[in-house]
A protein has these predicted regions:
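SAM-dependent transferase fold signal centered on methyltransferase-like domains
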Residues: 1-279
Length: 279
């Protein structure tokens, strides 16, 4: 928890956030977040969506993997990369990219919440990353669309929403350069695992199955949604890595330009046949 002295310092810089805060360390960065204890509903359960600025400590593993994937991708390119995180919350993911990955040229982090953008900007300054990280306060799709023009596109876009990423996929693929890497998180596992199948069909364009391997199906539904969305822009995808962890699924896919690439992605889509009488 912040001491009274630190709170006074924050106020002196015009950074009285209007809610209780505390310092957290993750990876190589130290940053301010809403006080987690305030939003606990039990000894083990924390509700990040109830906080004025989003931060989920359970997703640290997600961010750890993202750092490793982006570093490997940057090394495979052999040049500096430009990164965008359009739904940043407190800013920790984007700041970690800048602080922990060699070869990052620029990181643009954004949140539509003024409180989140304000806190993220403070965290960028606290970690001495203002030379690499810029903070934007606008709608995520508007931000991504502004970078959809040639020579403005990113090498890596990380979409990590609270819920489904489908609302941002169209803008995200357009904001990526040829061969760029798109990372998607989906936490709406109830539709994806068949509890609400109609919602899944509406969002992802596929029907889920309530089976013991429903999380694998969820990843494939997300990949299929990405493939069809990218194909509308004559882009194909190549899934490089995915995982299902705790309450979410995660997908990393390379986006390649060209109608042939799009056709190849669509041809890889198919159907799963499952007999509930046999299994």
């Amino acid at each position: 928890m912040l001491t009274n002295f630190v709170v006074d310092v924050l106020r002196g810089f015009g950074l009285d956030f209007g809610f209780q805060t505390e310092f957290v360390e993750e990876g190589k960065v130290r940053f301010v977040v809403p006080m987690l204890e305030t939003y606990k509903i039990s000894l083990r359960e924390y509700v990040p969506s109830g906080a004025p600025v989003f931060y989920n400590p359970i997703m640290e593993f997600n961010r750890d993997i993202a750092v490793l994937v982006l570093q490997a991708y940057q090394k495979s390119l052999g040049r500096e990369v430009r990164v965008c995180e359009p739904l940043t919350g407190c800013g920790v993911r984007g700041i970690r990219f800048a602080a922990e990955i060699e070869g990052v040229k620029e990181v643009v982090i954004n949140d539509i919440s003024r409180e989140a953008a304000k806190l993220a900007h403070f965290n960028v300054e606290q970690n001495n990353m203002t030379n690499l990280v810029s903070v934007v306060n606008e709608d995520a799709n508007l931000l991504l669309n502004r970078y959809a023009a040639p020579r403005k596109r990113f090498d890596y876009v990380d979409v990590d929403p609270f819920g489904s990423p489908v609302l941002y996929i169209d803008s995200a693929v357009r904001a990526l350069r040829d061969g760029g890497l798109l990372a998607l998180t989906a936490t709406d596992m109830a539709p994806l695992c068949g509890v609400y199948p109609k919602a899944c069909v509406r969002k992802y364009g596929g029907k889920p199955l309530r089976t013991e391997y429903c999380h694998e199906i969820a990843v494939r539904l997300l990949a299929g949604c990405l493939a069809t969305t990218a194909a509308r822009h004559e882009m194909g995808i190549k899934v490089l890595f995915s995982h299902s962890t705790n309450h979410y699924i995660r997908l990393y896919a390379q986006v390649n330009y060209g109608a042939k690439q799009a056709d190849n992605s669509i041809q890889k889509m198919g159907y799963i046949l499952h007999c509930f009488a046999c299994f």
